[in-house]
Amino acid sequence: SNTSFDRLKNIIITHHDIDHIGNINYLREKSKNNIKVYAYKSEVSYITGEETPFKLYMLEQMVDKIDDKMLSMLNVMGLGFKSSYTKVDVSLDNHEKLNLGEEIEVIHTGGHTRGHICLYLKESKVLIAGDLLQVENGELKPVDVMYSNKQELKDAIKNISNYNIETIVFSHGGLYQRNIIGTLKNLIIE
């Protein structure tokens, strides 16, 4: 790979799920830079390990009701989170604007996790959606996870539909560039 971790200077975390924080310590170790990690204020304690991540907490509450396979998965997940906790350098607020080459607006959405954020790049008209939205069979839809707050998801979609978005980038599933505002408004009605 031609990728050099030495080009990396900043990481903005959309939420504290393990697939979003899992390799940050590795990246920090491999880079010659002092990489700054940014996260929404209510996510910081989960990312640093001060609080148990919500999904892990929910699984731990069901430990007496789960089979051996799920218990094994819970143990692996717990170990994964513990090895992934990392320092957060910058705690973010809703509508905070960052200038990291282009102005980036922090949009607190909640829904997927309590402190989930999207990032809006006004000049590029790009929304980095984190795990708020996904593309399934070519169609834009909310992420359907059992721990998501459905009303917060709907409110978040309504909120982001007010931005001038031409491209949505997802954590899982690439890009979406077709009739974004119309599609978002239809998701609000559903």
In which residue ranges do the predicted regions lie?
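A generic secondary-structure signal
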Residues: S1-N2, N159
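Active-site HxH/HxHxD metal-binding segment of metal-dependent hydrolases
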Residues: N2-V90
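Soluble, non-transmembrane catalytic domains of enzymes that act on hydrophobic metabolites at membranes
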Residues: R7-R28, E96, I107, D144-K150, ...
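Hydrophobic/aromatic beta-strand patches that form the interior of the parallel beta-sheet core
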Residues: I12, Y38, V90-L92, I107, ...
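Core catalytic region of metal-dependent phosphoesterases/phosphodiesterases
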Residues: K36-A39, L184-E190
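Short, hinge-like loop/turn segments at secondary-structure boundaries
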Residues: P53-M58, Y147, N186-I188
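Metallo-beta-lactamase
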Residues: G80-S84, E103-I181, N186
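Cytochrome P450 C-terminal beta-domain/meander region
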Residues: S91-L100
